Structure formats: C-alpha cells, structure tokens
A protein has these predicted regions:
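Short, hydrophobic transmembrane alpha-helix segments
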Residues: 13-23, 145-146
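Intramembrane alpha-helical segments
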Residues: 135-147, 153
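Loop-to-helix transition at the N-terminal end of transmembrane alpha-helices
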Residues: 21-35, 156, 242, 355-359
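Membrane-interfacial loop- and helix-cap regions that link adjacent transmembrane helices
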Residues: 47, 53-73, 86-128, 151-155, ...
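Membrane-interface "cap" regions at the ends of multi-pass membrane proteins
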Residues: 1-16, 38-42
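Hydrophobic, membrane-inserted alpha-helices
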Residues: 10, 132-137, 334-339
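Juxtamembrane transmembrane-helix boundary signature
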Residues: 31-64, 79
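Hydrophobic alpha-helical transmembrane segments
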Residues: 17, 138-142, 340-346
C-alpha cells in the first residue's frame, strides 16, 4: 500500500524537469530525495512505536502539544482536500484522453489533437464527474486502508506497463522529435545531460523541480493508517521498517526509471506529461491502455489521501470517534465538494500544486524531525538530534 500512496500522474512529468536540470542531476536529486524521504519516514516509525500512537495528529499532540496538533490537523485537512481535487481533475482529464484515443466520440476525426473544449461542456462533465465521484465514495467508506492492499499492485502495474510502452516506442519518438527540433548550430536545442545552469533561471525551475520531487514522496500522513496493520503483529516494528524500506526503494527506483525513459523519448521538447503526447498517426492502442491503467491507479490512490483527512476531521470535531453516520456523511460531502470544485475551476491544478508543495514540507519533513527529537529523551544539542533537524530543515528550504 505504501507504494500506491505515491503514484499518480507526477511520475510522468519528470521529462520536462530534466530539460532544466540535466538528466544526470535530476536522477541524483531523485535518489537523494528518496533517501531523505526514507529517513523522515523512519523518524515517524520510531516516534509512533515509542509512543504507541498510530495517528499522526494524536502523536503530534502527545509529543509537541495541543496547539501543534491543531496546526497539523489544519494542514492535513487543507492538503488532503487540495490533493483530492487534483486527483479528481487528473482522473477526468485522463478519462477524456482515453475516450479521445479510442475515438468513441465522432468529434475527434484527428487522433493527434485532443480538443479540451469538448470536455469542458456541462453535458459531458456532469455525468462523468458524478460517476467518478460515486465510485470513489464507496471506496472511501472503507475504514481499514489495508483492505486496499491489492491497489498497490494496480498502481505499480500501471506505472511499469506505461514505462514499458514508452520505452518500446522510444526510438521512433526520439527520431521524430530530433528531426523536428534539433539544430546542430543551436546549442539550446541540444540534449541537456548535465547542465544544471538552466534550472537557475528567473522562473526558479530548480526549486520547482525539487518541490515536485518532495511532493511526489509526500506519503507521511497516509502511511500511519498502514502502520495499524502491523501494530499487533509479532515484530511489528521490524515489519514496519521493512515495509518502509521496500516501499521507498520501489517508488524511488520507478521514479528514476521514469526520468530516464520519458526523457529519452523526447529530450528536445518533451510534453508536460509524457503519456499525453501526440500519437504518431492513427490509434496508439498500447498508450490508450496505459492512460486507462494510470486513471485506475489514481482512483485507487484517492482513498489513501482521504483516510488521514477523515481521521483529522474526526479528531477535531468528534474526539476521534467515526460512527457509520459520520463516515457516510463526511465521505459523500467531501468527495462531491472536491468534484464540484475540480469541475468548475478546471485551472485549479496549478494553484493546488503550490498549496500542496508548501504544506507538504512542513508536514512531512520538519514535524517528523521534531517528533524524533522530543521522543529521543536527549537534548536538542545531541548530535543525532541536531543532524536530523538540520537535514529536514534544509529539505524545507529547498522545497519551498
């Protein structure tokens, strides 16, 4: 389940980042962020185990006080709603591209051009969003996230299949993009392997790229419900650590593979999202299936974002008690509100990505360091405490 908390469309956006970072430096950055993510998760595991708390906000109150808990609950609620809206909009966008690619609608005589305006029509938006939302509502009513373990296989399978499709088609798309964009005398059209200078432009691409990497690994609040499944098992702490190592290693490896494969497909002028690329004439059945699989992986990632939201709201208003009535009302209201906002304000993704990135760094990197420091029983001047705080604080500065 840990791996599925990370996967979404983000994994297919790294090619555009590589044009600024240089592929080599982006891969190095991806590996470093993966290592830091693993370390911050281990801080959460240690604090959770020592204090026998498997809820992020309750653990925060126990160690850092009620005011910090209120702050964390607010962050989790805002962050979760922002991510859920993004998932809604992305699922709808992918569904539209899937339908377009299958040519179900006769308005698409040209397979290469996706007419986004058609998908902004109310008579198409309304039934599709309602259908997606109802499906997500019934999934989110589940109380135990570990019952969705199978979704990890769907998420990993969707990513692996999509990367294989991109890899197999890489040669043809590379040749086509080189013919279109490469000019020998113009260095700006050359492949950027290791030039990090482009990232430090007025558009702050370096910080955008680093923030995207940190946000892609923001699974800290969603991982606590996963820990519940290990709590009463023999050697539960050891199993939690193994699951964390495996999950982060799997995610980081797939992220790095995605960077390399998607970048080499079109290193001259890549798409913002590699699976959105234009088909090279006629139907691309393999990529059409990939879009469907990625849509499913996003749908199954949705409950992993909703569960910590439900816990935070319950902790704030019902002392952590989640009755059946409360569960049903909150689930349907939350899902339909996110759906309504995502459908009406279709350009909201850009704003939500900034909100999510800003909140993520505090919630997932700074707070875990503080939890560990106060749990250790040693002063903040102790070398381990100082090193953990400095490391996580540097992550906050970079990701901001």
């Amino acid at each position: 389940m840990i791996t599925n908390l990370c996967f979404g469309v983000t994994i297919f956006t790294f090619a555009i980042r590589a044009t600024y970072f240089g592929l080599v430096w982006l891969v190095v950055a991806g590996a470093i962020v993966g290592l830091v993510t693993y370390w911050s998760l281990m801080l959460c595991v240690i604090a959770s185990s020592k204090n026998e708390e498997d809820d992020y906000s309750e653990l925060t109150e126990k160690i850092l006080g009620k005011k910090v808990r209120i702050f964390i609950n607010i962050i989790i609620i805002i962050y979760s709603y922002a991510v859920m809206m993004m998932f809604m909009a992305l699922t709808y966008s992918l569904f539209g591209r899937f339908v377009h690619a299958t040519n179900f609608i006769e308005k698409y005589p040209d397979y290469e051009d996706f007419d986004d305006e058609v998908w902004q029509k109310a008579y198409i938006k309304f039934p599709v969003y309602v259908g997606i939302t109802l499906g997500l509502c019934f999934m989110c009513l589940i109380r135990d996230i570990n019952k969705l373990d199978f979704s990890s296989y769907i998420g990993v399978g969707a990513v692996v299949y999509s990367l294989i499709v991109v890899l197999v088609q890489c040669h043809d798309y590379y040749k086509d993009s080189k013919d279109k964009y490469y000019i020998k005398e113009d260095k700006s059209t050359h492949i950027n392997w290791i030039d990090l200078g482009k990232a430090f432009s007025k558009d702050l691409e370096f910080f955008k790229g680093v923030a995207a990497l940190f946000t892609a690994n923001a699974i800290h609040t969603g991982i606590f419900p996963v820990f519940v499944g290990f709590k009463y098992q023999k050697d539960g702490l050891k199993k939690m650590k193994k699951a964390t190592i495996f999950g982060v290693l799997m995610v980081t490896s797939l992220y790095i593979l995605s960077m390399i494969i998607s970048f080499l497909t079109n290193p001259f002028q890549p798409e913002d999202v590699i699976i959105y690329r234009k088909s090279k004439g006629g139907k691309d059945i393999a990529m059409t299936i990939a879009k469907l699989f990625v849509s499913l992986s996003i749908i199954f990632t949705y409950p992993g974002t909703y569960f910590p939201l439900r816990l935070s709201i319950a902790n704030s208003f019902t002392n952590g008690i989640i009755s059946t009535k409360f569960n049903i009302i909150l689930t349907f209201v939350s899902c339909f509100v996110c759906s309504a906002v995502a459908s009406v304000y279709d350009k909201i993704l850009n704003y939500l990505s900034y909100i999510g990135g800003f909140l993520t760094v505090f919630m997932c990197y700074l707070i875990p360091a503080l939890l560990y420091i106060y749990t250790s029983g040693k002063p903040i001047t102790y070398w381990k405490n100082k090193s953990n705080f400095v490391l996580q604080f540097c992550c906050v500065l970079l990701a901001l």
